[in-house]
Amino acid sequence: MEQIYDMIVIGGGPAGYTAALYAARAGLSTLVLEKLSAGGQMALTEQIDNYPGFEDGIDGFTLGEKMQQSAERFGAVTELAEVYKVSLSGRIKTLDTSEGVFQSRTVVIATGASPRPLGVPGEEALVGKRVHYCAACDGAPYRGKTVAVVGGGNSAAADALTLSRIAKKVYLIHRRDSLRATKVYHEPLMNAPNVEFCWNSTVSALLHESRLTGLRLKDVNTGAERDLACDGVFISVGRAPATELFQVELALDKSGYIIADESTRTSIPGVFAVGDVRTKALRQVVTAVSDGAVAVHYAEEYLAENR
């Protein structure tokens, strides 16, 4: 007879491995399904300075490995597998994967959300080499340097404000002639002496040798191009939650995030959503870790009532 786990966690990022740690430590049989390696998007971050306990910071890959090891120390098992199909509505949840079919009484979805890329040549190869997607995560090394932020929404505006406090110069590049961000961001950005707006502009190329050295900007009205030197770029043109598997069964918001409140409970009993994949105000490593712990608290309640 195939094993039925108490909990299967889909995704091995900080939220997923925290859930696995808490579940395994509580004596629940726990399986983590991860298609790549520990850490998720966090593993791409060169330096994390805002996660407590590391006075000199830590890179995302190493932190992800440490989280995996902590969970496995208490008995959680990791299976490198991609999930192709899920059936979550029944009392026993079934997951079809590249490594076979797995069943569980509860499921924690920790599939995360990926930054939307600009789609210019060389972008993927430069990620982590002065090309970033999160100012709060990766901004600290740019103190006193020149950076660019691409985007015009709330995330881009927040990133530009964050960077303006540490960088010598911040270029905010937007394809329109005004910000889409809410008005609360406009005045602080306009008044920041080190923020310069590049209106009606898109990035047509990333200038680089082994690392980024600048951007090529294209005027959307005239087509004219110019080069802009910078030490780093922060791309903030939206995020895409990894929720394709769950569109049929789970309630999602208009942006595709799984609807779950601070309890992490979803629209299906026994199914929880944690980290960047769920509706929430702040998507950071530390809030993802919190979600993982909370999910196990409510999963234990659910299991006690549904054994």
Residue ranges: model-predicted function:
Residues 4-6, 80, 143-145, 200, ...:
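Phosphate-coordination loops involved in phosphoryl transfer and adenosine-cofactor binding
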Residues 5-74, 157-183, 253:
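Beta1-alpha1 glycine-rich phosphate/pyrophosphate-binding loop at the start
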Residues 12, 111-112, 237-238:
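Glycine-rich, N-terminal phosphate-binding loop of Rossmann-like dinucleotide-binding domains
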Residues 71-96, 101-102, 164-262, 301-307:
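A Rossmann-like FAD-binding core segment of flavoenzymes
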Residues 78-143, 147, 152:
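Glycine/small-residue-rich loop that forms an oxyanion/phosphate-binding "nest" at active or ligand-binding sites
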Residues 119, 124-141, 237-287, 291, ...:
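FAD-site-proximal beta/loop scaffold in flavoenzymes
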